[in-house]
Amino acid sequence: MEANKIIITGGATRIGASIARKLSGPGVELVIHFNKSKRKAERLKKELLKNKTRVYLVKGDLSKENEVNKILKFAKSKLKYFDCLINNASLFENDKLENFTTDSWGKHLRTNLRTPALLSKEFAKNIKGKNNNIINIIDQRIFKLTPFFFSYTISKTGLYTLTKTSAMSLAPKVRVNGIAPGPTIKNKRQSEKHFKKQFMATPLKRQVNVSEICNAVEFFINNKSITGQVLAIDSGQNLNWQTPDITGGKE
């Protein structure tokens, strides 16, 4: 696999940690960003060191530009140059048009859209060769819009657009693609019952395995003829005409 100088935001837990494991190995250097998950980040680092991966941990609040700049400075000092950026971290809070606040709106847009844009800009300035990749972790809801999770959805549809436009801007040296996951890992708002209801309501009636998302990341890195694409890995959830948030389930 042609990715050895890698930055992963939100890489200490959940999907981000699984991607870090997938991309790790001898000769690989990983900068793993975290915010509140220091212990999990340290455990992951210890795990990855066993397979001869060089791991560098960096803490930062992605809603604050000065902290994003510190992350970039740290990554440059450790890796010297980059060949893969995984914009995985995101803020996911529920609001609607009727009750959103400027604080919630701002945090979602800064964390989920502005920061990936800033990281992408600096990534493109610090590359070598022509096989460089940015992979944005988005959300299947960009293909199946609802009025729920208003600020989050706006930020993720923006990230979808960023994926497309940056693929145009950064070609041919950087390929930019995205993954739009469906029900993969239960979130803090959901009970096991509600999560099962969510994935059983998909056409394929199955939970997305995180390994399938990791395989897609590897596929995008290895396939040099793909850019500007967003792949839904969601058991067909974006095809539903009635989604759990409409029928009374929790997301």
Predicted features along the sequence, with ranges:
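Conserved NAD(P)H cofactor-binding loop of Rossmann-fold oxidoreductase domains
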Residues: N88-E93, G236
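Conserved glycine-rich Rossmann-like NAD(P)H-binding loop of the short-chain dehydrogenase/reductase
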Residues: V28-R43
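Catalytic loop of short-chain dehydrogenase/reductase
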Residues: N133-A171, P183, Q237
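Short C-terminal tail/terminal secondary-structure segment
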Residues: K144, T227-E251
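Conserved glycine-rich cofactor-binding loop
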Residues: A12-R14
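C-terminal substrate-recognition "lid" of short-chain dehydrogenase/reductases
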Residues: V210-I233, N238
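Substrate-binding pocket helix/loop in short-chain dehydrogenase/reductase
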Residues: K96-L97, S104-L109, Q198
